Structure formats: C-alpha cells, structure tokens
Amino acid sequence: MPLLRSNYNPSIIFKSGFFSTVYSGLFRHLKINQDRELIYLSDGDFLDLDWGYSNTPTKKVAIILHGMEGNAQRPYVSGVAKYLNLNNYDAVCVNFRGCSGTKNNKFFSFHSGQSDDLVQVIDHVLEKYSYEFIYLKGISLGGNIVLKYLGETSSIPTQIKAAMAVSTPVDIASSSNELHRFKNCLFHIYFIIGLKLKLKKKQRQFPSKISRLLLWRIWTLHSFDELYTSPANGFKDAADYYDKSNSLQYLPKINTPVLILNALNDSFLSETCYPYVIAEDNPFIHLETPKHGGHVGFILPGKTYYNELRAVEFFSKFD
C-alpha cells in the first residue's frame, strides 16, 4: 500500500510536538454521556467498559483502547468516542485492568502486550450485542495492543472491518529508550510517579508479593518493567517483555485494513516506529506520518482533533 500523504497542517503554535502533547493532555475538556458496564474475565478479574451511543440506532461500534497511565475518561479517548457517536457509531471505551479507579483483583495489571484482554472484550461485544460492523482504535500503548492482536490472531471475526492505531510505539524497546532520554524527562517523571502510586496500592493488596524495598528500587520505567511488569506477567525480564509484546513483528501478518497515524515529531517514538517498508509490502497497512502532531496531539481549530476525523474517514470506507 502506498504511504499516505497527510493533510494535517496545524497552526504555528501546534507545530511544536512538545506543546501539542502537553496541550491535548492538560487543557482539553469534554462532556460526554457514557454508561459503565463491568465484565468479568476468564481469570476472575474484571474490566470496566464505558459506553457512548449514537443518537440513532446503529449496527456499528468502535472499541477504543487508551494509553499508558490513561483511562477511558481521558479527553484523547472520550474525544474519539464523542465524534464517533456524532457520526452514527456506538463506542465502547475500555479501561485496562486497574485503570478505571477500582483496583483489579490480580497481582498483575495491564501491560503493552495484553491482547488477550482485547479478545475477551471483542467476544463479549459479539455475544451480547448485535453489531454487524466492529472497528478497533488504539491510542499509544492501546495501539500496540490492537496491532498485535490483528497480526497474531489467525481468525479475526468477520464483523471486524478495520482498525486504527494512533501515536503507537510499535517497537516497545526502542520507544522505552526514547522515553528515558533527557528530551522526555518531564513525561518520564509523570509516568513513573503514576505507576509507582498504583504499585504502592498493589503492595498493600499483595504484601507478600511486593516488598517496600522493591518500591524504593523503582525510579525509571525500565526498572518498573524489570522488577514488576515482567515477573508479574510471566516474562523473564524487561527485554523478554519488550520482545514478546511489541507489535512490529506482527505487522507483516495483518490482513485487516488498518491505519497507523504516527507524527514525525512524536518524541516518544523511535525511528523503528515508522514501519515504511512493511507498509509498502502489506496492502492492508495504511501508514500516515504527518510532520506535526506530537504524541496524541493532532490539534485542530474547534472541538474535533485530526486523529478523530481520520478515524471516521477511514472507518466509513468499510461500512
């Protein structure tokens, strides 16, 4: 598939990747009506799903996955859901384990390769509802999960028509290295503070499995993955976790239409997160790499952001 030429051209102030990333995360506020549904998983844990609906009955639904240290209420998620609702799509925003405001039941939490939870969400939607068209949209870490699912799953349900991944670190190891660079120090601090707060709650929940000493040893995202994420989820170490969870290795196997939207000035992404060669060889992968946008920025005048417009434009081709 030829690489897509992007039409995204923001105003001067939003040509800065840093400012776009910060602005969209801190200064956007949305109102959206949603209903929460709790579903139980096969291992005894649960997920909270936040549903928003089209004003008219529809057979179309989008399943939306958030990023690291996010949840279904973040503006970059609810903005997508709201715009989809306005365009006759229902939208179900998934809160990963431990991200909905209620601690999950298990020692392990969510991670960037946890596509088996997405499988159970899809199965739930198929079994309980009568949608004929299902679309997937993953943002950042959620995008990696969507792409991994599409590439590793041998039999995709026929109702899944297309997908989109935004600001997605398809190569987790190299993106982790980018987050540890000085240019991302403020974001790195933000992420590790949030993750450690959750881990402290997990330590009180499972004191025999997490020592207070371990909490003091975690000061970086890599040490968090090395000392908690990896052992809690059955990986040998952080390198093994990154290797088995990254979606880059699965992209050649994808046979569902998917749009990958990664800005060139996204400071979280490494060079390998722009899979030009794979996209050229795989007719199902549409790769759009605008010059601007930052990490989950893509700001436009008005209330709707560029990645939200692109989701509706892309999905509507497969209705």
Please tell me what each predicted stretch does:
Residues 129-131, 135-233:
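Alpha/beta-hydrolase-fold enzymes
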Residues 73, 81-105, 287:
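Conserved alpha/beta-hydrolase
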Residues 59-67:
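Short beta-strand element of the alpha/beta-hydrolase
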Residues 97-135:
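Catalytic nucleophile-loop/oxyanion-hole region of alpha/beta-hydrolase
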Residues 280-296:
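Catalytic histidine neighborhood in serine/cysteine hydrolases
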Residues 254, 260-262, 266:
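Short beta-strand/loop motif that positions the catalytic acidic residue
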Residues 293-306:
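Catalytic histidine-centered segment of alpha/beta-hydrolase-like enzymes
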